């Protein structure tokens, strides 16, 4: 007799629909990802992950416009990965976003990293609040062969697998140049830096100060 083709489940239909996303919908966020190429993956093509793999992303804060966008990006990445690999149900890759309850709290972030490493993720992405923190945790991650990728604000730790961030030196330099231009290269300037501990803030402050001192 004829063999009936099994009907697609709702989950499989959803995956297929995600695969068939229109070009217009893709452009909503793909353009932003293209900007960081080739420093990091800007799509899911060629990425190989096992069923049920867990990836942990740790930010600096919750509930602000910037970090809400980061969190949305994490969710989108998980959806894209599962759609690309065809994983459904319990097979899905899990990607979570966690951050300190109080923005830029160093101790809370270190504790979060400890907790996440205890779950043995296949990789950790972290935006580091304090450049001097997390060294012990990074050693543990290295010993456990858990890759660490920094984003937004990185670390000098040699074992970091990759960094995805703005060129902070270039950003600080350009900000100083434009400031000096608006001031007509005369007068006094005040720099307001968001914090005094993160790599991003320190690099931008130094670059801006160096530019103003040397050339204006």
What are these regions (language model features)?
Residues 2-216:
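A residue-level marker of the well-folded mature domains of exported/periplasmic proteins
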């Amino acid at each position: 007799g004829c063999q009936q083709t099994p009907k697609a489940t709702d989950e499989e239909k959803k995956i297929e629909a995600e695969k068939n996303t229109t070009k217009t919908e893709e452009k909503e966020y793909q353009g932003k990802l293209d900007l960081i190429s080739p420093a990091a993956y800007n799509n899911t093509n060629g990425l190989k992950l096992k069923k049920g793999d867990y990836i942990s992303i740790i930010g600096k804060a919750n509930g602000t416009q910037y970090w809400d966008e980061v969190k949305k990006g994490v969710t989108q990445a998980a959806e894209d990965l599962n759609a690309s690999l065809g994983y459904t149900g319990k097979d899905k890759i899990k990607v979570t976003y966690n951050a300190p309850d109080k923005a830029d709290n160093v101790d809370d972030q270190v504790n979060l990293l400890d907790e996440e490493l205890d779950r043995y993720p296949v990789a950790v992405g972290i935006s580091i609040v304090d450049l001097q923190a997390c060294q012990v945790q990074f050693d543990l991650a290295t010993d456990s062969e858990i890759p660490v990728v920094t984003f937004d604000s990185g670390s000098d730790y040699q074992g970091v697998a990759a960094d995805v961030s703005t060129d902070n030196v270039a950003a600080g330099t350009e900000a100083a140049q434009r400031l000096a231009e608006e001031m007509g290269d005369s007068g006094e300037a005040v720099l307001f830096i968001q914090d005094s501990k993160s790599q991003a803030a320190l690099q931008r402050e130094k670059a801006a100060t160096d530019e103003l001192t040397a050339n204006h």
